[in-house]
Amino acid sequence: MPRLAMNVQYASEWDSLPNEKQFRKWARAALRVDTEATLRIVDEEEGRMLNRDYRGKDYATNVLTFPLEEEPWLVGDIILCAPVVAREAAEQNITLESHYAHLTVHGILHMHGYDHEDEHQAELMESIESFTMIQLGYPDPYSSEKRKR
């Protein structure tokens, strides 16, 4: 089983944030290789600044991933924007815990090189996310979208 070294930083005092043990459990479930990650929970201002500075998009997004190194361990940062995650969970009528789990898995997969830039890549990444979420005991985050395709 791949090893995980994870530092969780709470830079946002948002309500109902998962604890470090939960984040580590979700990240471990998606690991493919030994990984060292920093997972940072941010407010909307920091999320917007990071998205603007690194992606050229002037809004806060739910998750950003910054892979930094590949050898000998995969190293990178995952940023979760607490207000955006909470808003999306409410809009999608899903639990906040489930949405945090999904976005943590999603971020780890991005660190591992998975992407959703074209339909084939998106289908592969989504299938891994769906499998991982079900293994963790959560609903398939794409089940309603798959029915629409």
From Swiss-Prot:
Keywords noted in UniProt: Cytoplasm, Endonuclease, Hydrolase, Metal-binding, Nuclease, Ribosome biogenesis, rRNA processing, Zinc
Cofactor, how bound (note): Binds 1 zinc ion.
EC number: 3.1.-.-
Gene Ontology annotations of biological process type: rRNA processing
Cellular component GO terms, alphabetical: cytoplasm
Compartmental location: Cytoplasm
Main location: cytoplasm
Gene3D superfamilies (UniProt xref): Metalloproteases ('zincins'), catalytic domain
Group of enzyme by EC: hydrolase
Cofactor(s) the protein needs: Zn(2+)
Record-stated family: Belongs to the endoribonuclease YbeY family.
Function in brief: Single strand-specific metallo-endoribonuclease involved in late-stage 70S ribosome quality control and in maturation of the 3' terminus of the 16S rRNA.
Protein name: Endoribonuclease YbeY
